Amino acid sequence: MKKLLTCCFVLAFASVLFAQTQTLSEPNPETVGADSAMMSLREVSVDKFEREGSWNVHMSPDNGVIAARLFKGNPAMKEPLPEDEGKEDLDTQVLGVRVDFFRRGINSFNIMAGRPMPVEGTVKTVSMWVCGRNQSHDMYLLIQDYFGRNYEVYMGNLGFSGWKKLTAVIMPSPDGEHGIVQSSAYYGDKPGFKILGFRVDCNPIQAKGSYYLYLDDLRAVTDLYDLENRDEDDMLDNW
């Protein structure tokens, strides 16, 4: 009997530890801004980095030279969305970025979308697969909220080698006016924000020589409850 109780205790402790590890490794969109029991979370594709010329790169010409282009490749750990199953032949490329630094110092570079990319609904998280080169630079997501105000959200440190999924958590506005606002009852009925691109702040010690970075599969987890539960005969405030 004592051995049975000991085994049960060990199994219970292991399951709790595994759950905590999962929670710490990746943000749970269901708990981000969960002020209502009514949610309809959906993971949507924002961009697959398949179109040449749809992304632009910039950095100060005093600090170095930057270039970007598409390459054949894919993260092996990436799981396709349900609507993309069977269409793997349409998702075969990644965006490669190369930076050649002139000297070590406080540098940064931007990876910007050709045009702002809207994401409908109340966005909880934004994720992207990044192939790093084990240099301790920091990546930020650049967004524009419902009122056209620009914000940056920390995605993670690039001190790893190979592919890794980075996730930015979008914290809700506390009062509908401050912070990242995604909806307003006074100015329209379509919640969401726009993704402008990314900024990488370089570690001054490691910003030398050539640096390579690869991006793929930009996604968002968004709450579409308000959009999916509109009455069919409701009027649209878009005039």
Predicted regions and their residues:
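Beta-rich carbohydrate-recognition modules and glycan-binding surfaces
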Residues: 20-239
